[in-house]
């Protein structure tokens, strides 16, 4: 009995800290992450989950050599700033004020904040959102609004 209890305590303690998954680089979203922007090489994508109520942070790392010739992180920032003006997805620069990006920053919201950080050689694309709102339930509400002829964001906390 003691050995079994000890094994359960060790297992439970593993769930206290954040855990990374998708380590084999076969994450189910990689295909769409390549298809939608037209990437020829899949990015490195290994999300991290943790035991807290809501919120999620995802990141995709890029090397400058993966960009079109002559393009830089500043070009990505400019494209994000032009494209993601809200209310559902908003670009923020800098991503955070204190050097730490919290996965819970958008908890309770049905919107998403995207950012670009890094340097001239290594670029990090990040998104922060509430996985409960911006996920399936938010999408269901957007679809319902579309069918009912309402504004897409009706009933969402953007």
Task: Report the location of each language-model feature.
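C-terminal active-site/capping subdomain that shapes the small-molecule cofactor and substrate pocket
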Residues: 61-158
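Single conserved hydrophobic/aromatic residue that forms the stacking wall/gate
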Residues: 1-10
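Oxidoreductase and adenylate-handling cofactor-binding alpha/beta cores
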Residues: 30-43
């Amino acid at each position: 009995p003691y050995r079994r209890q000890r094994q359960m305590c060790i297992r439970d303690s593993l769930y206290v800290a954040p855990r990374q998954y998708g380590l084999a680089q076969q994450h189910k979203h990689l295909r769409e992450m390549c298809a939608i922007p037209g990437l020829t090489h899949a990015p490195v994508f290994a999300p991290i989950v943790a035991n807290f109520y809501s919120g999620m942070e995802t990141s995709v790392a890029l090397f400058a050599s993966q960009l079109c010739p002559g393009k830089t992180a500043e070009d990505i920032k400019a494209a994000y700033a032009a494209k993601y003006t809200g209310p559902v997805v908003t670009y923020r620069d800098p991503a955070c004020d204190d050097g730490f990006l919290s996965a819970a920053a958008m908890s309770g919201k049905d919107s998403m904040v995207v950012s670009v950080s890094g340097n001239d050689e290594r670029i990090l694309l990040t998104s922060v959102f509430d996985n409960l709102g911006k996920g399936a339930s938010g999408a269901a509400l957007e679809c319902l609004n579309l069918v009912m002829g309402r504004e897409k964001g009706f009933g969402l906390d953007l």
